[in-house]
Amino acid sequence: MANSNTYLTTPTKTPSSRRNQQSQSKMQSHSKDPINAESRSRFEAYNRLQAAAVAFGEKLPIPEIVAIGGQSDGKSSLLEALLGFRFNVREVEMGTRRPLILQMVHDLSALEPRCRFQDEDSEEYGSPIVSATAVADVIRSRTEALLKKTKTAVSPKPIVMRAEYAHCPNLTIIDTPGFVLKAKKGEPETTPDEILSMVKSLASPPHRILLFLQQSSVEWCSSLWLDAVREIDSSFRRTIVVVSKFDNRLKEFSDRGEVDRYLSASGYLGENTRPYFVALPKDRSTISNDEFRRQISQVDTEVIRHLREGVKGGFDEEKFRSCIGFGSLRDFLESELQKRYKEAAPATLALLEERCSEVTDDMLRMDMKIQATSDVAHLRKAAMLYTASISNHVGALIDGAANPAPEQWGKTTEEERGESGIGSWPGVSVDIKPPNAVLKLYGGAAFERVIHEFRCAAYSIECPPVSREKVANILLAHAGRGGGRGVTEASAEIARTAARSWLAPLLDTACDRLAFVLGSLFEIALERNLNQNSEYEKKTENMDGYVGFHAAVRNCYSRFVKNLAKQCKQLVRHHLDSVTSPYSMACYENNYHQGGAFGAYNKFNQASPNSFCFELSDTSRDEPMKDQENIPPEKNNGQETTPGKGGESHITVPETPSPDQPCEIVYGLVKKEIGNGPDGVGARKRMARMVGNRNIEPFRVQNGGLMFANADNGMKSSSAYSEICSSAAQHFARIREVLVERSVTSTLNSGFLTPCRDRLVVALGLDLFAVNDDKFMDMFVAPGAIVVLQNERQQLQKRQKILQSCLTEFKTVARSL
């Protein structure tokens, strides 16, 4: 193994006169080279474009070099070597937590480095910083100020520094915070993960070149950060690997085989990846910039000399000489970046033209918006057209639509229950699953599904058990006035009370669920309106920026739907009060005995024969036929009778009396008995006798549906309590049937859907536009809004000027390519 002292000797100073002569001759050759002049103009154009992109938040695919690595892997030293001067003279660990965009400009007139920092919120640069020690202080202070403002440990917002110097290349590098395993004292524990995530985000764009640094003392197989680089660029196609502090490894090489194996890095980086091996001066004493650059050059020379003379057999110079030394890396980075700049110039020019056009359009829209703040008539017209368009889209969604995609905007039954906050149906213990419950629906389809779900829930409720005390309190009160009448009225009163108690919450829940379905249509109508305008490229007024107006439209629509729900609740409650009135019993009783739709509901989740509800979800195929909600049960002559086909012994009471018939036809039976009863008995006794003498088979109620039993096992042998309970269940079923089939369904449709189709645009128009101009303009011009719009226009104008300047410069560059 070679002695380590043989390759590092104390640097000696080059005579000042000879050094100045070398520098002057090099600068003269650079100034006379037309290729370098062309490269510099291209580099300057990209630098200005990069500054504009940082200032205005533009996402431009500018070729850039991103330096990544561990916090102690020598990134700062490499940047200083590229700059040609030291800026962290005091060797203080900056520990920056923000990216640093370092724009190096080869300026022959800058015999001393001139560093300027771009303003945080502008594309302008500050005054030149002459003191090298001030550079690190500015980086540190800016980082601390931003992190304190954002209350974060790291920030992706970059610091931009422009360094003009005669001894630096035309190069731009983004220095990233170094990877760390553990947070510094006072930092959050998540800081290492946040740094890793931010660096990956900065290095991921495909137009960026990765400059990955790793100390030579770290073996490839145990590299902690090499895996992170592989996640960003798995094939290393855009990664330049730099082995830093290479001088620390030289003493371990004894023969050529060891050196060549190490330099090839075979088995870890792939066959086409050749890392660069760099060593930099370790002397951190205060020296001049010229001496610093001389030491860099001397270290390169000493490393090559040691590999040639200090290692037995030397090394494969033909294969590895171009990858060793800082000078080789600097030349490669500069040439590689210039090559990428040249390749990207046409695409950059096209992108700049597109961005300039977009900014011009934004300027026109902003001018129109500022002008519109004083044109009330124009705003009224645009707002009315927009509101009418939204209302029309709501109507179209109610009538049935497939745009936008129901898979994205629709909801299943479970999602509706959860998002509405209503949950299950009150008083229903079973899980109600209407047809198509698993499909994502909206609009009219979702409305009809909720209606059917309400029907299923209503028919799942049985008449609740009644205590003997309640029966006795009603029955015994009528004991002295005829037992038959007492039994009938007791059962009817029990049924009416149960219906009011159990069906009223169902009606309120149905209204709330339907209101949620209609309320959800506003967002879908907005999306539909946006898609339609985009699809047909309609030149309608852009209302996107008027937040106050959009909030007002949303609030008006929400109030409209809530008012509909309130009105519908009152209507269905009125129907419930009517059907549970003692005077309505004769109507639904007679109709029932002639055969009504009620007989079809022998299971809680079955629809009536007149209801059409198609099961479209896949789950229905696997269920037994008897559980199909949308298929009516098979008819049984012994259990139900077709409406209008009753037996001759039954009295037909029309559901809706004909205008040509007097009302006495409907209630003639009762009136005749009141006026002409031969036995002198009152109407109530006659009614009790009429009900008691009908040929009705005994029955029982199961799951809310009517199940007929044999007459031999009927009420003849039952007690008065059992008779009343059975009769109450019968009355409850009749009340429920009349309420659901005749009243509620049609009321909900006419109470919700018809107003949304016919009155929505009028209601919104009255709320929004039937006001004076001052109140109307409050939706569009908030206090100070005009000043904000004017400031936005100034920013757009500034952005337009910068981008136009970059475009002109790139056009000049493109002509020279």
Curated annotation (Swiss-Prot):
<keyword id="KW-0206">Cytoskeleton</keyword>
<feature type="binding site">
    <location>
        <begin position="175"/>
        <end position="179"/>
    </location>
    <ligand>
        <name>GTP</name>
    </ligand>
</feature>
<dbReference type="GO" id="GO:0005525">
    <property type="term" value="F:GTP binding"/>
</dbReference>
<dbReference type="GO" id="GO:0003924">
    <property type="term" value="F:GTPase activity"/>
</dbReference>
<comment type="function">
    <text>Probable microtubule-associated force-producing protein that is targeted to the forming cell plate during cytokinesis. May play a role in cell division.</text>
</comment>
<feature type="region of interest" description="Disordered">
    <location>
        <begin position="1"/>
        <end position="37"/>
    </location>
</feature>
<dbReference type="Pfam" id="PF00350">
    <property type="entry name" value="Dynamin_N"/>
</dbReference>
<dbReference type="GO" id="GO:0009504">
    <property type="term" value="C:cell plate"/>
</dbReference>
<keyword id="KW-0131">Cell cycle</keyword>
<feature type="domain" description="Dynamin-type G">
    <location>
        <begin position="59"/>
        <end position="346"/>
    </location>
</feature>
<keyword id="KW-0493">Microtubule</keyword>
<keyword id="KW-0378">Hydrolase</keyword>
<dbReference type="InterPro" id="IPR001401">
    <property type="entry name" value="Dynamin_GTPase"/>
</dbReference>
<keyword id="KW-0342">GTP-binding</keyword>
<dbReference type="InterPro" id="IPR030381">
    <property type="entry name" value="G_DYNAMIN_dom"/>
</dbReference>
<feature type="region of interest" description="G5 motif">
    <location>
        <begin position="280"/>
        <end position="283"/>
    </location>
</feature>
<dbReference type="InterPro" id="IPR027417">
    <property type="entry name" value="P-loop_NTPase"/>
</dbReference>
<keyword id="KW-0547">Nucleotide-binding</keyword>
<feature type="region of interest" description="G4 motif">
    <location>
        <begin position="244"/>
        <end position="247"/>
    </location>
</feature>
<feature type="region of interest" description="Disordered">
    <location>
        <begin position="616"/>
        <end position="658"/>
    </location>
</feature>
<keyword id="KW-0963">Cytoplasm</keyword>
<dbReference type="InterPro" id="IPR045063">
    <property type="entry name" value="Dynamin_N"/>
</dbReference>
<keyword id="KW-0505">Motor protein</keyword>
<protein>
    <recommendedName>
        <fullName>Dynamin-related protein 5A</fullName>
    </recommendedName>
</protein>
<feature type="binding site">
    <location>
        <begin position="69"/>
        <end position="76"/>
    </location>
    <ligand>
        <name>GTP</name>
    </ligand>
</feature>
<feature type="binding site">
    <location>
        <begin position="244"/>
        <end position="247"/>
    </location>
    <ligand>
        <name>GTP</name>
    </ligand>
</feature>
<feature type="compositionally biased region" description="Polar residues">
    <location>
        <begin position="1"/>
        <end position="20"/>
    </location>
</feature>
<dbReference type="InterPro" id="IPR022812">
    <property type="entry name" value="Dynamin"/>
</dbReference>
<feature type="region of interest" description="G3 motif">
    <location>
        <begin position="175"/>
        <end position="178"/>
    </location>
</feature>
<feature type="region of interest" description="G1 motif">
    <location>
        <begin position="69"/>
        <end position="76"/>
    </location>
</feature>
<comment type="similarity">
    <text>Belongs to the TRAFAC class dynamin-like GTPase superfamily. Dynamin/Fzo/YdjA family.</text>
</comment>
<keyword id="KW-0132">Cell division</keyword>
<feature type="region of interest" description="Disordered">
    <location>
        <begin position="405"/>
        <end position="425"/>
    </location>
</feature>
<dbReference type="GO" id="GO:0005874">
    <property type="term" value="C:microtubule"/>
</dbReference>
<dbReference type="GO" id="GO:0009524">
    <property type="term" value="C:phragmoplast"/>
</dbReference>
<dbReference type="GO" id="GO:0000911">
    <property type="term" value="P:cytokinesis by cell plate formation"/>
</dbReference>
<feature type="compositionally biased region" description="Basic and acidic residues">
    <location>
        <begin position="618"/>
        <end position="629"/>
    </location>
</feature>
<feature type="region of interest" description="G2 motif">
    <location>
        <begin position="95"/>
        <end position="97"/>
    </location>
</feature>
